[in-house]
């Protein structure tokens, strides 16, 4: 497909559909969806990416979900991947507020998931995407039934969340919100060498992403802006409020990486204890990007995923024609 990209090591899963959809505030989002490999669907999984990621990075995950009988919907958040970039410098990861991401998710639900794929609808989300998923779950009306989150951004590793929120808030107030938050000079984070990385121990999967971005640098991203970091930390502190626990009405499973060095596992554990509908599993040895990890860690994750999402009622096992289309003839 013209708006999806592949490499020899990362082919587009068969049956792909892709299109751009427009948000109410005028942002163009790149979306993709697949129906399952079998002739019936167990429902739909929405895959929500982390910061600086793109649809292509999740092709392997898409294939694994399709083999399990799910339709899959995924998309690039505004400001990254193939969606509308937020600033004149397209390599800066920027939003003014995380509520903009909720607009993206609601748009994709309305324009892609609901009209093209069958219920039940569940979410699989990573890091930044996981934080957005929790914000979405707290809204009064959501069609999502369950969520599986990997390494959610509930706080930064090292306990710097509050301090950095205050500092970035001051700088943002002074009009510096579009500056890089750190020593970035437009270098694409996906092109950094494998050695010393903090996201995966699997060199093959790491190099697969590097190869993709080398071939299609327009999908890559550099560092976040001060405004992005401030908004992310504000969202994390909101999720940590005691009253937020009463606003998550659906079951959530969180997968924590045992060798996590980006987000705070302690914050995840505290979050799990506060909310009775949330459970967690720690995958010893895994690094931050569990879905991009070595198979021995991913197998643990997928076993937990399968047990948690479970087998829907037979009533949901419908042919994967688009909702609203005429039923297939016997």
Which stretches of residues belong to each language-model region?
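Short beta-strand/loop motif that positions the catalytic acidic residue
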Residues: 248, 254-256
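Short alpha-helix in the alpha/beta-hydrolase fold that links the catalytic acid
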Residues: 250, 263-273
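Conserved alpha/beta-hydrolase
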Residues: 55, 62-88
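Alpha/beta-hydrolase-fold enzymes
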Residues: 128, 132-220
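An N-terminal hydrophobic leader/cap segment in hydrolases
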Residues: 1-22, 27-37, 330
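Active-site glycine-rich loops that stabilize anionic/oxyanionic intermediates
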Residues: 42, 48-53
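Catalytic active-site module of serine/aspartate enzymes centered on a nucleophile-bearing elbow/loop
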Residues: 284-330
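Alpha/beta-hydrolase active-site loop
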Residues: 93-113
């Amino acid at each position: 497909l013209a708006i999806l990209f592949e490499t020899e090591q990362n082919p587009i899963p068969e049956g792909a559909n892709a299109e751009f959809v427009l948000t109410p505030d005028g942002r163009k989002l790149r979306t993709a969806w697949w129906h399952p490999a079998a002739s019936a669907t167990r429902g739909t999984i929405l895959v929500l990416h982390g910061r600086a990621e793109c649809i292509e990075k999740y092709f392997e995950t898409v294939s694994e979900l399709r083999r399990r009988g799910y339709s899959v919907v995924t998309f690039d958040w505004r400001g990254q991947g193939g969606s509308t970039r937020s600033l004149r410098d397209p390599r800066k990861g920027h939003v003014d507020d995380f509520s903009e991401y909720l607009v993206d998710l609601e748009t994709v639900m309305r324009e892609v998931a609901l009209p093209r794929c069958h219920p039940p609808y569940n979410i699989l989300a990573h890091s930044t995407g996981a934080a957005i998923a929790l914000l979405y779950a707290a809204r009064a009306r959501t069609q999502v039934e369950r969520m599986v989150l990997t390494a959610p951004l509930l706080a930064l590793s090292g306990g710097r969340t509050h301090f950095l929120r205050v500092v970035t808030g001051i700088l943002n107030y002074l009009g510096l919100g579009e500056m890089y938050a750190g020593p970035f000079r437009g270098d694409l984070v996906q092109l950094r060498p494998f050695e010393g990385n903090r996201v995966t121990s699997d060199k093959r999967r790491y190099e697969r992403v590097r190869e993709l971005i080398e071939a299609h640098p327009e999908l890559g991203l550099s560092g976040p802006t001060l405004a992005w970091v401030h908004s992310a930390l504000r969202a994390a502190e909101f999720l940590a409020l005691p009253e937020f626990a009463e606003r998550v009405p659906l079951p959530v499973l969180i997968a924590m990486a045992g060798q996590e060095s980006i987000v705070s596992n302690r914050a995840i554990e505290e979050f799990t204890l506060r909310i009775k509908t949330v459970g967690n599993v720690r995958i010893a040895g895994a690094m931050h990007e569990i879905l991009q990890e070595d198979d021995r860690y991913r197998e643990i994750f997928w076993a937990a995923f399968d047990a948690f999402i479970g087998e829907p009622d037979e009533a949901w096992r419908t042919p994967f024609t688009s909702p609203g289309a005429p039923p297939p003839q016997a």
